[in-house]
């Protein structure tokens, strides 16, 4: 209690000092600065009464605190929402470290009996969800010892501000075993940090203690088995230079018109769009010479012999198919009678990518060579050609609306039946209950910093509310490096399918898809089944990443920002089926299962005459 009074006095003196300094400033009539009601009050009165407060909720899910309750000063009515504000103060060694705004709510919206609160204090209620992993500019709470206090500020009808600081009070009944502990992580391309966060009740000060201890801080690249880093960096640079030199030499050789290359740094086998284009090419019974250069990750090393082979076949192939970001090819000048074709792995156009992100956090340099040498890009509809042209920095004439080959799968009834039967045989539990598939995109600026903050999911509540009717599958983006860490007591409900390669197969056995900003919504829409957009950070995502369309009008399903909202939508089946049909017809020109045919017809066997080059070998 003594510490609360000290904190209050410091805040009060600071605000009085600021007020005196401000009153010495002559405000010119032409000065059109706008202040909040709390910043332009005539004077501040230090309250002499102990405020009334009660905590109705103090629960933790990972590093996320949900706090609610009420607080008011006797004799100071709170009838108007815009005349009161409350904050949770974090105090380190007696000094205010930071303050988190609390959302003001009417007291009758709280989950406890508030009949003893006089009607004059209608806006005494508050609630907030605070993520301590993202507290400081998207970084965790720094290492240190903190105490929590509540602050209330209220402006009366005479434009006088009243302010009070008080302890949170005894919330030990909300803490199992009188203590709570969790871990926090921070991911970026150059830094990985891990913390322990310990929460307990301070009997002396009658408030909450937070103890944050840093466990680890390391450069993620050091976690890779890479001895002799400087030497390896030199060797990689040398190998890359040799690759470029070899490519230029091999360009002097004739193009082999029946040679087709498939290259990817995100798959080890011929799956996805590659699979459907490859199978269509086999149907044509032509004498194709196929070459495959496949790696599971952009981090996988390529040996010098591999690079020489790639240089030769890239230089002498008629067509090179890629399906993702493929950096080694971007500095190359593609030959006049050859094609570099991007069979982009994502369908539709949703969140901005590539050069559409110039100027945004993690966006590319305008002078980058990435993507610009594509001679062809395939997309799902005419409506999105302009977005892919902008994102890849290519002419719109190079973007062709053939449809996306892997979506042919959804129109092949025999193949769908076979896949479903195979899945039910391999995973019998998929048949017993309805299936929820959780498939969000990653957070971070790219592969090196990719992660997902699983603490935003309330595992316990999802389990208790949905386990009788559903099972919950995780299909996390392959870039994500942190794990869901499913608690063992929920292992009959949560299942991790992140290593399952083809998400389109899982969509067949899915009853409800939960995603956020992932392009999986386009393919799932072809099945006309319900989806939920769990976008807890949509405001931040719009600011940092942005979209090609207004997100709230775009999504063909309800928006949920919390686990509670997600559960409510599922249990009450509040889905937006009526929006799915128009969504599908905007992002897909052809719903016939013949996208692979069109890709082969328009790229491998184009109808128009091409200029003849005497360096092109005949089959």
UniProtKB/Swiss-Prot annotation:
Keywords: Cell membrane, Cell wall biogenesis/degradation, Membrane, Teichoic acid biosynthesis, Transferase. The keyword Cell wall biogenesis/degradation applies. This is Teichoic acid poly(ribitol-phosphate) polymerase. Its main location: membrane. Responsible for the polymerization of the main chain of the major teichoic acid by sequential transfer of ribitol phosphate units from CDP-ribitol to the glycerol phosphate attached to the disaccharide linkage unit. Synthesizes polymers of up to 40 ribitol phosphate units in length. SUPFAM superfamilies: UDP-Glycosyltransferase/glycogen phosphorylase. InterPro entries: Glycerophosphate_synth, TagF_C, TagF_N, Teichoic_Acid_Biosynth. GO terms for molecular function: CDP-glycerol glycerophosphotransferase activity. It is a peripheral membrane protein. GO terms for biological process: cell wall organization; teichoic acid biosynthetic process. Pathway: Cell wall biogenesis; poly(ribitol phosphate) teichoic acid biosynthesis. It catalyses: 4-O-[1-D-ribitylphospho-(2R)-1-glycerylphospho]-N-acetyl-beta-D-mannosaminyl-(1->4)-N-acetyl-alpha-D-glucosaminyl di-trans,octa-cis-undecaprenyl diphosphate + n CDP-L-ribitol = 4-O-[(D-ribitylphospho)(n)-D-ribitylphospho-(2R)-glycerylphospho]-N-acetyl-beta-D-mannosaminyl-(1->4)-N-acetyl-alpha-D-glucosaminyl di-trans,octa-cis-undecaprenyl diphosphate + n CMP + n H(+). One of its GO terms (cellular component) is plasma membrane. Belongs to the CDP-glycerol glycerophosphotransferase family. It holds the Pfam family Glyphos_transf. It comes from the Bacteria. It is found in: Cell membrane. Its EC number is 2.7.8.47.
């Amino acid at each position: 209690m003594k510490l609360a009074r000290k904190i209050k006095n410091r805040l009060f003196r600071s605000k009085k000092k600021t007020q005196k300094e401000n009153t010495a400033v002559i405000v010119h009539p032409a000065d059109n600065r706008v202040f909040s009601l709390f910043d332009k009050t005539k004077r501040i009165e230090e309250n002499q009464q102990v405020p009334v407060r009660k905590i109705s909720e103090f629960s933790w899910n990972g590093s996320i605190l949900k706090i609610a309750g009420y607080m008011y000063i006797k004799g100071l009515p709170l009838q108007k929402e815009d005349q009161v504000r409350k904050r949770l103060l974090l105090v380190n060694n007696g000094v205010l470290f930071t303050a988190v705004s609390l959302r003001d709510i009417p007291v009758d919206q709280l989950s406890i009996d508030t009949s003893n609160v006089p009607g004059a204090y209608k806006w005494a209620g508050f609630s907030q969800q605070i993520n301590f992993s993202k507290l400081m500019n998207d970084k965790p709470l720094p290492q240190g010892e903190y105490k929590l206090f509540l602050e209330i500020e209220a402006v009366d009808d005479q434009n006088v501000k009243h302010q009070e600081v008080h302890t949170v009070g005894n919330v030990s009944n909300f803490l199992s075993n009188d203590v709570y502990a969790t871990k926090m992580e921070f991911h970026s391309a150059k830094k990985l940090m891990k913390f322990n966060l310990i929460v307990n009740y301070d009997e002396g000060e009658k408030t909450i203690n937070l103890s944050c201890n840093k466990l680890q801080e390391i450069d993620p690249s050091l976690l890779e088995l890479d001895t002799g880093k400087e030497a390896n960096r030199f060797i990689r640079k040398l190998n890359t230079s040799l690759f470029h030199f070899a490519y230029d030499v091999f360009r002097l050789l004739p193009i082999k018109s029946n040679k087709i290359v498939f290259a990817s740094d995100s798959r080890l086998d011929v799956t996805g769009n590659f699979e459907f284009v490859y199978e269509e090419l086999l149907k044509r019974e032509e004498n194709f010479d196929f070459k495959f250069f496949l790696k599971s990750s952009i981090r996988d090393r390529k040996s010098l012999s591999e690079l020489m082979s790639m240089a030769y076949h890239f230089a002498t192939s008629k067509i090179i198919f890629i399906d993702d970001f493929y950096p080694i090819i971007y500095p190359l000048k593609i030959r006049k009678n050859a094609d570099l074709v991007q069979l982009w792995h994502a369908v539709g156009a949703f969140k901005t990518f590539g050069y559409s992100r110039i100027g945004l956090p993690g966006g590319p340099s305008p002078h980058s060579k990435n993507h610009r040498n594509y001679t062809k890009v395939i997309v799902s509809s005419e409506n999105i050609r302009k977005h892919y042209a902008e994102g890849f920095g290519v002419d719109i004439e190079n973007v062709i609306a053939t449809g996306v080959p892997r979506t042919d799968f959804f129109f092949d009834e025999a193949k769908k039946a076979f896949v479903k039967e195979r899945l039910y045989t391999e995973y019998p539990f998929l048949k017993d209950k309805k299936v929820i598939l959780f498939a969000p995109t990653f957070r971070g600026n790219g592969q090196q910093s990719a992660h997902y903050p699983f603490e935003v999911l309330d595992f316990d509540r999802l389990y208790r509310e949905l386990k009788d009717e559903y099972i919950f599958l995780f299909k996390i983006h392959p870039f994500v490096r942190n794990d869901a860490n499913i608690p063992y007591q929920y292992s009959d409900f949560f299942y991790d399918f992140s290593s399952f390669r083809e998400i389109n197969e899982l969509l067949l056995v899915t009853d409800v898809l939960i995603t956020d900003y992932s392009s999986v919504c386009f393919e799932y829409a072809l099945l006309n089944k319900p989806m939920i957009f769990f976008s807890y950070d949509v405001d931040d995502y719009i600011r940092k990443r942005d979209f090609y369309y207004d997100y709230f009008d775009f999504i063909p399903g309800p928006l949920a920002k919390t686990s509670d909202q997600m559960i409510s939508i599922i249990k009450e089946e509040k889905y937006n089926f009526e929006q799915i049909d128009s969504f599908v017809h905007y992002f897909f020109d052809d719903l016939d299962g013949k996208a692979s045919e069109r890709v082969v017809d328009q790229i491998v066997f184009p109808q128009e005459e091409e200029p003849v080059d005497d360096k092109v070998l005949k089959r």
